[in-house]
Structures are given as structure tokens and as C-alpha cells.
Amino acid sequence: MPLAQLKEPWPLMELVPLDPENGQTSGEEAGLQPSKDEAILKEISITHHVKAGSEKADPSQFELLKVLGQGSFGKVFLVRKVTRPDSGHLYAMKVLKKATLKVRDRVRTKMERDILADVNHPFVVKLHYAFQTEGKLYLILDFLRGGDLFTRLSKEVMFTEEDVKFYLAELALGLDHLHSLGIIYRDLKPENILLDEEGHIKLTDFGLSKEAIDHEKKAYSFCGTVEYMAPEVVNRQGHTHSADWWSYGVLMGKDRKETMTLILKAKLGMPQFLSTEAQSLLRALFKRNPANRLGSGPDGAEEIKRHIFYSTIDWNKLYRREIKPPFKPAVAQPDDTFYFDTEFTSRTPRDSPGIPPSAGAHQLFRGFSFVATGLMEDDGKPRTTQAPLHSVVQQLHGKNLVFSDGYVVKETIGVGSYSVCKRCVHKATNMEYAVKVIDKSKRDPSEEIEILLRYGQHPNIITLKDVYDDGKHVYLVTELMRGGELLDKILRQKFFSEREASFVLHTISKTVEYLHSQGVVHRDLKPSNILYVDESGNPECLRICDFGFAKQLRAENGLLMTPCYTANFVAPEVLKRQGYDEGCDIWSLGILLYTMLAGYTPFANGPSDTPEEILTRIGSGKFTLSGGNWNTVSETAKDLVSKMLHVDPHQRLTAKQVLQHPWITQKDKLPQSQLSHQDLQLVKGAMAATYSALNSSKPTPQLKPIESSILAQRRVRKLPSTTL
């Protein structure tokens, strides 16, 4: 079932009440009485050892880039390591002032550091360093660029029960690992589940976790986020790992008071839009007696993994991260922070020395420092290789940034309807880039930016490096295409064969198939938007550029849709439109293929052809496959051209079918004889005329004053003179 029409992943719905479970009962007031055990605070001894030869980290080894967040425990910064062995690597640095931490908070901080140092799991955030100064504690963690799961699912995506199952399954593996170490998580909520750049989850924020010696030991403190608390936590009757499995299945209420009442009185219900398997799992998780709760038995998480709801999950593949996530966050360079609250990212990063705490506080944190052994070679010596140093990407954070402060603008590379492209040089690094300057009054670039952020890491899609906005224009800084346009390169070659054309089309079709599989259509795949990043002429160096007309498949409410949602819940007319747009992309590739093989364009003889003449030829669907180069071109090539240029867009091959065509799969059988071609400028002129004619066939309606309409003028003529 589709779920994303909800404002929150688990809002309170009209529910069918569950029968309260016999067993534990408690008055609501029980949650208000402090526990005797809660007042006992003990320092947690730290027994972790550091590999011989490792060096302790300190604040001077990290360059502050941005503020990512701020909470009751301190600030989180995006930082770059500036010393070996991992110089250039980006981390999230959690900084806590000792002087402002309560004693209880200090214990929690040490607890978080101990837990993270122990944990090594694909779905739990990794601790790389921990150290302290006189006034502060530092945790250096993975920098997870995808933001938190709650923000992503509630604000951006139409998702289904199948999609939610993926996240819950990864979460179950992460929790199971923590439980195997004797750790109760106790603060499980969507805000503490982050996404990496691929869309896999990572559990984070272990400040409320509690290590238990064995499964019999209970914790008593009143902690966690109330919406997700198990009844035994609210009632302070002692809780074990099973409290996490309650939180795992909880439905979030409208407000804290209402949620607390529901938890205490067991007035939980079951949303009827869920499948029977999902309802069965929730009923098994929502047992007020923790001993009866699924996951609390001797098999632990294995009970949950065996549940029928997860019958479609391959747990081994999931652990190896081989199952594709339903949603890929839009992230560009490794140091971007598009997915963090602008309230924090717009602040100037500043880490003050911190007021020294009381005399005994430093002793409380003894043994706090930690170095990840993964940063050392097997023999204990530091690694000699360095991570690549990335250029700083300045992002839009509600301010107008001056592009010329960071870059020197050079000559114009190209001019479009809504933008101009220029070469530019980054002042700090002297690196060359291209900048696309878009007139905001003529075009909204937000979709183009989002697509480039989400998919620009593909090897054959242009990479977005930086974004500026001065109010009137948006500046998109991308890698510089030094090799020029595809057709220029091909037609200037002294020798170009059919086999080489197959390699070129293979690379481009692979990229288009990737975009289409993600619900993205380019809609402007003319040859001038396919360029080489260098002058090698290698097909793998091709880049698809200019996503100004590109679209992502969205629902009527504007949200993106996961593949599962698209397959099950999208209206036929929406899919038909998407198929039409995909067909247009294939048609453009067909034009390119025809031109590479024939040496001239299929529907235009030259730049002097009128749009009407060109459109008539396109509409007829007729083009020649005989004479000239066609006498030596293979029959499989002619077959592919015919199927890509079919007059009906819904009967054209898909990008996937193009990749499966014998002309692509059996390149070694293709001729290697030289293909002749018309004059370069004639071919380019004819190609430009073709796309100009296509654009002219879609006139934009012009809105005029209502008084200028024929109906309004006729009414004025009929009015008596006294009313004028």
C-alpha cells in the first residue's frame, strides 16, 4: 500500500482497538515516581586498548567546515582531517563542553564513546577517533550525507509498505548487533536513523544507550523519546533489550501527552491500510508484557527475522548491502550539506576552547581517547596513501553568495535559451571548471540541481561541483568538458568505424538506461549535450550534460516515487507520459546513431531547411537506409536505427532493449571499415536545424490582457453608451 501521503511515517490513525494484554498493569502515575536505582551514578570504566604505534588525535588535526547540528549535549561539525594517514577525509565531529555537562550527561557521553568503539557494523555509525581537551570531549564519526530517515521519507518520497520493509530489515540487523554486545539502544526514532549517500541506514546517537552485563540485568532510568517508549520504560519497572523492539514497531502519536496515555493504558490500535503480515508483526511487537514481545526470547532478533512479514528479505544479501535501497538521497561532492538543517549549516563553524570544568571532571573522562585501528597498516605503521583532497563546495544556506568571490570568470563556452556557459577558475585551487549561469526569471533550476546532486556521481553524467545564487542568477559549477562535443570529435577523426560507433552508443545508452530506471528523463539529448571530459576520445570519457529540461517522475502532490510505488500505484496516463518522454530520449539517440553511421542527419539536409520541411519528414517517419555508407553498414545496425526512430514513441525500443540488441552485444562482428561523412559544419547545421524545428513545434501560449480578447471586445461593443 502507498504510505507517503501521510505527513509523518507513523501518524495516529483511526484505529481498530487491540485487546489489552493480561499481565502487567500499572497506573499512569507510576511514570511520575523516581526510581531508587535512577539516582545511583557510577563511572563506567574504559577498558579499550589502542593498537601500538597509533597516534592520538587532537582538535588541530581537523579543519572545521560547517555546523551540522546542535543539541542538548553539544555541537556537531563537518570537519576535514588535515594530517595523515587519512588527510582530506571528511568526518562529523561531535563536540561536548565538559563544564556544561551534568554528571549524568557526562556518563552518557562516555557510554556513547564506549559503545561506538566496540561496534563495527554496516548499519551502525562508526567511531574513528575520540579525544578530550581540558574543556571538551570530541567524538569523530562517519559523515553521513543523506540526512535522517524521517526527513527523507516524510518530505520527499511516495513510498510503500515494501519500501518501509527494507529500512526496518536493515534496522533489525543493526539493533541485533547492538543487543549481541549487551547494549540497549533505548532512543530508537527516525531522527536517529541516518542515510548514507547510497540510501542505506546507519544508527546513530548513543547518548541514551545502556550497556548491560547480561540479559537478566534491567535498566530503570526514564529515558528516550516519549513517542517511542515501551510501557515498562514509562512505568520504570525495569527494561531490557525488548524495549527496543517496542520502539521498533511503535506508531507515533499526535502529541506527547496523548502518546504517553496510549502507552500506559495499552489503547493501541492497528492501521487498517497495512497488510495482514504487517499487522501481525505489529501485534507481536506491541505486547505490554516485555516477556511476551517478539524479539525478547532466547533467539532475539531471529524471531523477528523469521516473521512472515520478512519472508521476501534475503538477510545475507541485506547485510552485504547488496539490496538496492528504495530511495537515493541527492548528494553531490563528499563535503556537501544539502541534507542538514539550514538553521545550522548557515552558521560560521567555530569551536571555542571551552571553559575548563571543575577539578575532578577530567578524572571522570580518563581513558576517553580512542583511535580506530583501521587507519593503521597491519604492521601498526601509518598508511602512506592519502585520501583525495576535495575542493570545498559552498552551498546555498539562505544567503546570496557572490560567485566572483570564489571564481574568476573566463571566456564563453556556449549560449542557450535560458543560460550561458563560461569557463571559470577556482581562486583558491586554480582548478578550471565550467559555470552555467541561469537566468532565474526565465527558468527555475531547482529540478536540474536536484537531478545533478542525486545522479551526478554516475561516471557518464556531468558532475556538479558548486552552486551560487545572487538573486537574479543561479551559478552551477561543473567539471570542464575539455574534449568538446561528441559529433565534433567523431567527424574530425580521420578514421571512424561502425564498431567504434557501437562503443559510443553503448556508453550513452547505458547512462540513459540508468536515468530511466531512476524515473528521470533528459528530454534534450541532442548531440551538442553529449561531450568528452578530456581529449582522449575514449567513449568512457563521455558525459551527458545540460539537464535543464530533465524531469523526475513525481506524483500529483509533487513528491518523488520509489520504484515500488511507481510499479503499483501510478496512474496509467502518468506512466504513458513517462513512456513518451523516454521514447523522445531514445529518438534522440537514434538521430545520433543515424548520423554517426550515415555521415549526415536523417531529416534535415542542411541548415537552410525550413522547420516545416523538417517536421514533415519527421512526421512521416521515413528516412533512407540505402546508398553511401549504408551500402557497407551492417544489417543489425539498420535494424537498430529503424527501431529507435520508429514514428510511434511507444513502439520504440527502450534503453534496456537497445543495450540487449545484437549490434551492441556483438561488437566484435561489426565492420571496421572507415565511414565517410559530409562536411562537419553542414552536418552540425542540419542537426541544429532539426532540434530547432522540434522546439518551434511546441509554441508557448502567450497570456495577454483580458481586454484584448475577441469576446471582451464584442461585449464592449454591445454595451449601451451610458455604461461606458
Curated annotation (Swiss-Prot):
EC code: 2.7.11.1
UniProt-listed SUPFAM superfamilies: Protein kinase-like (PK-like)
Keyword set includes Transmembrane: no
PROSITE patterns noted in UniProt: AGC_KINASE_CTER, PROTEIN_KINASE_ATP, PROTEIN_KINASE_DOM, PROTEIN_KINASE_ST
Gene Ontology MF, one: kinase activity
Activity regulation (UniProt): Upon extracellular signal or mitogen stimulation, phosphorylated at Thr-562 in the C-terminal kinase domain (CTKD) by MAPK1/ERK2 and MAPK3/ERK1. The activated CTKD then autophosphorylates Ser-369, allowing binding of PDPK1, which in turn phosphorylates Ser-221 in the N-terminal kinase domain (NTDK) leading to the full activation of the protein and subsequent phosphorylation of the substrates by the NTKD.
Modification Phosphothreonine, positions: T348, T562
Cellular component, GO annotation: cytoplasm; nucleus; spindle; synapse
Subcellular location: Nucleus; Cytoplasm
SS bond list: none
Taxonomic superkingdom: Eukaryota
Binding residue positions for ATP: 68-76, 94, 413-421, 436
Chief location: nucleus
Statement: the UniProt record of this protein carries the keyword Membrane: no
InterPro entries according to UniProt: AGC-kinase_C, Kinase-like_dom_sf, Pkinase_C, Prot_kinase_dom, Protein_kinase_ATP_BS, Ribosomal_S6_kinase_II, RSK_N, Ser/Thr_kinase_AS
Any one Gene Ontology BP term: negative regulation of apoptotic process
Function: Serine/threonine-protein kinase that acts downstream of ERK (MAPK1/ERK2 and MAPK3/ERK1) signaling and mediates mitogenic and stress-induced activation of the transcription factors CREB1, ETV1/ER81 and NR4A1/NUR77, regulates translation through RPS6 and EIF4B phosphorylation, and mediates cellular proliferation, survival, and differentiation by modulating mTOR signaling and repressing pro-apoptotic function of BAD and DAPK1. In fibroblast, is required for EGF-stimulated phosphorylation of CREB1, which results in the subsequent transcriptional activation of several immediate-early genes.
Similarity annotation: Belongs to the protein kinase superfamily. AGC Ser/Thr protein kinase family. S6 kinase subfamily.
Subunit structure: Forms a complex with either MAPK1/ERK2 or MAPK3/ERK1 in quiescent cells. Transiently dissociates following mitogenic stimulation. Interacts with ETV1/ER81 and FGFR1.
Protein name: Ribosomal protein S6 kinase alpha-1
Organism: Mus musculus
Gene name in the database record: Rps6ka1
